[in-house]
Amino acid sequence: MRRLLFATLLFPVAAAAQDHSMHDMPAQPAPAPQEAPVDHSMHDMPAQPAPAPQEAAMDHSMHDMAAMPGMGANAVGGSGSALLPAAEGAMRGFHATTTGNWMLMAHGVLTGVYTDQGGPRGDDMAVVQSMAMLSASRPIAEYARIEFRAMLSLEPAMGRRGYPNLFATGETANGRPLVDRQHPHDLFMELSARADVDIAPGTSLFLYGGPVAEPALGPSAFMHRRSARYLPLSPIGHHWFDSTHITYGVVTAGAKTDAFQFEGSAFKGREPDEARWNIDTPRLDSWSVRATWTPSPHWTAQISHGRLKEPEVQHPGEDEARTTASLHYARGGLSAMLGFSAKNRLPGDTLTAWVGEANWDLSRHHSLFGRIENVANDELFPDHADPLHDRLFRITRFEAGYAHRIPLGKAAELALGGSLAAYAKPAALDAAYGKAPISGTLFARLALGQ
């Protein structure tokens, strides 16, 4: 019988009596019966606390997130400057309003994962995935706001080779290509700042970037999408859609209305190197543009194009022209995404990928999720002596799973679940991968917020 390992996760939740609900505000002492209620509209900043000995008490309201840069009536912020449907809800976590009108937010995810990837080229492994995000935002003028963001991960501790993930490619470890494995994230996933200035009712300009940030290319990264919330492993199409979500050197400028956002970025095209604990030298040698349409709180669509200078160390001298399009939907407990990407190696072939994924919260405790991917990959056999070296194969991956959610107060959650994955592939791969490999994954996901 195969060994099954779950990490025991302990997460301190301070001040358990505090209310972090998206809808329930902590009761405030009213100075008079006729006092007007606080306005939490999308356009008003949080009201100043009345002078009192309790003035410094922290406000843990989830509605205050609406005042953060990048949000509007129809959209909320995803990763970088990307947008998602407002019906997904703002990112949740621990919030506090301090003196100086700074709004602080802390959000984190710690996931113990055991995966058994099937077939002759599969492997099994237990790993811990992690992400912690801190942000601070405040108004700097009547019509201007600023935000600072930091996102960190301890995944480099799992080693350069990462974890098994059948048909995943695109990185190296110890100078050798990683095949059928997913690399760990860097320690520094984001160190960025953003400034927004309102120029007309419902219209603003923004500037975003930093030494570690995300350019305006592709959809919101998979770990920030509600449609991928409980999917335990990275998508095998990661290098088609959101491989730029950790980029060393980004400057983005854009304009936003309630229905549209247009933006352009200058950034470093080369993906992070194998040294995951440090910050690579920032550079601005690549560019991208993105247009996003948010017609209602339930729909978001984006199309983007970028020119990346030598993004992958495995393909020296090759630039990449990448085009992506995605459609996102959210209503009630359902979040879904459909995406397409084409990366054209210059010089070289154009490789395309499709992805469809969804998460459905059936109730407060039960969720179903799934993802279907179809990618054209020519990196499965890096050995030049292999007869299948540089051959292009189209792979389809089907994954579905279930999560049992256990609320821990109003701002934390433990989710226990698992998924199964099957694959459709050309017969030429049977000798290497087996005729019908099946992969299984179990996870325990502890989240502060989201």
Regions found by a protein language model. Give the residues of each.
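N-terminal periplasmic/intermembrane-space "pro-region" immediately following the signal or transit peptide
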Residues: A17-H107, T111, G122-D123, S135-Y143, ...
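Residues that define the transmembrane beta-barrel architecture of outer-membrane proteins
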Residues: W102, D124-A132, H185-L191, H245-V251, ...
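Repeated loop/turn-to-beta-strand initiation elements of outer-membrane beta-barrel proteins
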Residues: L104, E142-I146, P201-L205, A259-E263, ...
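Transmembrane beta-strands of outer-membrane beta-barrel pores
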Residues: L110-G118, L152-M158, P211-P215, T257-A259, ...
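Outer membrane beta-barrel transmembrane domains
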Residues: S304-Q314, S335-G348, T352-N359, H365-G409, ...
